[in-house]
């Protein structure tokens, strides 16, 4: 029997014991009292009574051992740019974004819609939401206004985080006009729109609603934003299905179970170790991007490579 077969057999023979062991891969502010509650199957509850935070486990807990280690590499073959962030630098950027969101009125349990290209600020926004207990809903960048409007109406975000434009296959895709039209079509009206200006396209602002990320980022420098400890079963994000088989459906992920499953997969599926680098050819608008561009590698203490471009075009 191979090692992977042995692990699989153990998980089937004693699921509660197995997952209790895997739960030690992350930090818990409050220990869980029950690994698995299947009393309302198939609506299983994981790590009942435990409290944790995705951002803490992806960023903060690594600072003591690897603050200077690379955490996020960003490469854009679209704009011929590259940036890298250590765990300490990532912590600073995420803290700033969290302070901005709080300054715009976002509280625990609020939804934040992220409609962005593959740029570091998109990851900052996701982690910042996790930090303060907000629920992010990432929409694939460049989605048409009608599709975006449907997700705005369903998620009902307090704040939208977006950018002037993305670039794909050498073509600039202006996001702001698509977003403005989507909000015009929506019954729900977000209170604020936070905008990252990449200077790729014109970005007219709507007074009283649109906010400049760069200005806010300077304003909140040095502000400390503690992690909000969430019950294991509280939602971490909502991600919509593509809609190819009907109306898009919002799929909600919990916090504790998701973190433990990801941390476990990084070793047993990907053989990832702290200090390694992982590249996942996906987009944060899809679940693979959530799990294996942003959260999974960081939970494992690895560096993640975020790529703006298409895998088939250099």
Set out the residue ranges of the language-model regions.
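A short helix-loop-beta submotif of the ANL/AMP-binding
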Residues: 98, 111, 117-145, 155-160, ...
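Conserved AMP-binding/adenylate-forming core of the ANL superfamily
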Residues: 55-56, 72-127, 144, 148-149, ...
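AMP-dependent adenylate-forming
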Residues: 36, 58-85, 196-207
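A short N-terminal helical cap/helix-turn-helix that marks the beginning
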Residues: 10-33, 50-73
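Conserved pre-ATP/AMP-binding loop-to-beta segment of ANL
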Residues: 68-70, 193-195, 207-240, 247, ...
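Structural core segment of the AMP-binding/adenylate-forming
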Residues: 127, 131-215
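Conserved AMP-binding/adenylation subdomain of ANL enzymes
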Residues: 259-277, 287-314
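Conserved adenylation A10 loop of the ANL superfamily
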Residues: 79-81, 238-250, 266
């Amino acid at each position: 029997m191979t090692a992977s077969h042995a692990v699989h057999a153990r998980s089937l023979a004693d699921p509660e014991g197995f997952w209790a062991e895997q739960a030690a891969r992350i930090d818990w502010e409050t220990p869980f009292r029950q690994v698995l509650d299947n009393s309302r199957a198939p609506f299983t509850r994981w790590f009942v009574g435990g409290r944790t935070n995705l951002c803490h486990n992806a960023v903060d807990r690594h600072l003591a051992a690897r603050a200077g280690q690379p955490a996020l590499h960003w490469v854009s073959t679209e704009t011929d740019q590259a940036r890298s962030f250590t765990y300490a630098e990532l912590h600073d950027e995420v803290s700033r974004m969290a302070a901005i969101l709080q300054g715009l009125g976002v509280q625990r349990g609020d939804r934040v819609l992220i409609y962005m290209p593959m740029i570091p600020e998109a990851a900052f926004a996701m982690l910042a939401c996790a930090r303060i207990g907000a629920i992010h809903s990432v929409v694939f960048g460049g989605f048409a206004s009608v599709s975006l409007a449907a997700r705005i109406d369903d998620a009902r975000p307090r704040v939208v985080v977006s950018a002037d434009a993305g670039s794909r296959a050498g073509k600039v895709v202006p996001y702001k006009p698509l977003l403005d039209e989507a909000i015009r079509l929506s019954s729900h009206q977000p209170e604020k729109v936070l905008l990252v200006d990449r200077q790729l396209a014109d970005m007219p602002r709507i007074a009283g609603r649109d906010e400049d990320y760069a200005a806010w980022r300077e304003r909140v420098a040095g502000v400390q934003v503690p992690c909000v400890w969430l019950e294991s079963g509280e939602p971490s994000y909502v991600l919509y299905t593509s809609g190819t088989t009907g109306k898009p459906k919002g799929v909600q992920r919990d916090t504790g179970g998701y973190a433990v499953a990801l941390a476990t997969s990084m070793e047993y599926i990907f053989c990832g170790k702290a200090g390694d680098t992982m590249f996942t050819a996906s987009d944060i608008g899809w679940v693979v991007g959530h799990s294996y561009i942003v959260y999974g590698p960081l939970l494992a203490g690895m560096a993640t490579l975020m790529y703006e471009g298409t895998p088939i075009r250099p």
